[in-house]
């Protein structure tokens, strides 16, 4: 990753070795800070999973999300007309039923996390805001090289509309998670804050 970064910077050119070293230092510090933030978010998510309980998913929610996820897999991996079952059984180390079971477990976990974060958002008065969402969508498009919003939305749902609605929920959940992260007391492995 750093090699690609240096190559990109190299086309801009450095005037001195000190400039290159300073840029390398900045890159490493930024990378370290990003890793730290990611680790904190992950630890907060783990803790939320420990202390919060979702007794059951609303009727139809799992089925609807599974339909979307399986359609996404099929769209991504089966553009040649093959079935997802054939694709999984020919390329994965599991049979199709095992694959579906694993995906179901993952989607169930994701939905429970989503419900926990939606409850936090509601309790904290965190609401959807269009400007923030537009910025979020712009970042997704830039980071993952989507050419237009419709294509981005379609990659998250059965249609552009359902994908957009899903991303709106993800956006609000991310704001709720950030609120929890910002209020968390974080200690390193040595026990210092």
Across the structure, where does each feature detected by a protein language model lie?
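Conserved interaction-surface patches within small, structured recognition/assembly domains
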Residues: 101-106
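Peptidyl-prolyl cis-trans isomerase
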Residues: 1-97, 108-193
């Amino acid at each position: 990753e750093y090699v690609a970064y240096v190559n990109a910077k190299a086309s801009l050119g450095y005037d001195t070795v000190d400039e290159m070293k300073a840029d390398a230092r900045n890159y490493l510090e930024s990378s370290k800070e990003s890793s730290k933030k990611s680790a904190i978010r992950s630890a907060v998510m783990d803790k939320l999973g420990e202390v919060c309980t979702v007794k059951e998913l609303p009727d139809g929610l799992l089925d609807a999300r599974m339909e979307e996820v399986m359609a996404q897999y099929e769209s991504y991996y089966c553009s040649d007309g093959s079935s997802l079952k054939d694709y999984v059984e020919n390329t994965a180390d599991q049979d199709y039923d095992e694959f579906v079971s694993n995906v179901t477990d993952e989607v169930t976990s994701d939905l429970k996390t989503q419900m926990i974060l939606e409850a936090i958002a509601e309790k904290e008065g965190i609401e959807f805001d269009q400007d923030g969402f537009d910025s979020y969508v712009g970042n997704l498009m830039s980071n993952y090289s989507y050419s237009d919003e419709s294509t981005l939305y379609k990659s998250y749902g059965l249609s552009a509309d359902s994908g957009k609605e899903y991303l709106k929920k993800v956006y609000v959940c991310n704001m709720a998670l950030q609120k929890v992260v910002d209020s968390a007391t974080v200690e390193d492995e040595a026990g210092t804050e």
